[in-house]
């Protein structure tokens, strides 16, 4: 059970340290569930409570997700070690990124459903 009854996680990302990250669409939060002890920690998404985070992935030691209601749609990187965020306008507008996955090389691929695109984020 998540600590806030209003949480509505859309997608999950498994990290390499036995934790699960979730994009809380309804509240505009990024959350982490530690599978070893059940503890949950949450961070407000950079664009605020109406940002509607959706697609999410773990790649090269960081969490990547999309704020679907930010205008323009925003690509977010979260560093779990420093607990800090970086943001960029989503290339091509992005709109709602419903799913993200990671290539064998550790880059992020996105499904941008409302703009008929598949995106590629090269992580350097």
Task: Indicate residue ranges for each PLM-predicted region.
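A short beta-strand motif characteristic of beta-propeller blades
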Residues: 1-2, 39-45, 84-90
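Beta-rich, blade/repeat-based domains predominating
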Residues: 3-18, 48-66, 93-105
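A generic "binding-loop/recognition-motif" signal
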Residues: 5, 26, 36, 49, ...
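Residue-level signal for WD-repeat beta-propeller blades
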Residues: 14, 24, 34, 57-58, ...
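Conserved beta-strand positions in repeat-built beta-propeller and related beta-rich domains
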Residues: 20-26, 63-70, 110-114
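A short loop-to-beta-strand structural motif that recurs across blades of beta-propeller domains
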Residues: 29-32, 73-76, 117-120
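Short loop/turn segments that connect beta-strands within beta-propeller blades
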Residues: 34-38, 79-83, 122-124
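Blade-level signature of beta-propeller repeat domains, shared across WD40, Kelch, NHL, RCC1
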Residues: 91-124
């Amino acid at each position: 059970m998540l600590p806030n009854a209003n949480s509505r996680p859309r997608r999950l990302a498994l990290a390499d340290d036995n934790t699960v990250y979730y994009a809380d669409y309804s509240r505009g939060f990024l959350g982490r569930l530690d599978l070893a002890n059940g503890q949950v920690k949450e961070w407000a998404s950079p664009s605020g409570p109406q940002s509607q985070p959706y697609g999410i992935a773990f790649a090269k030691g960081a969490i990547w997700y999309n704020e679907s209601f930010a205008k323009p749609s925003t690509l977010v990187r979260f560093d779990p070690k420093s607990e800090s965020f970086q943001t960029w306008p989503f290339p091509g507008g992005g709109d709602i990124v419903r799913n993200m996955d990671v290539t064998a090389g550790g880059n992020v691929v996105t499904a941008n459903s409302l703009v008929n695109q598949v995106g590629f984020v090269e992580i350097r």
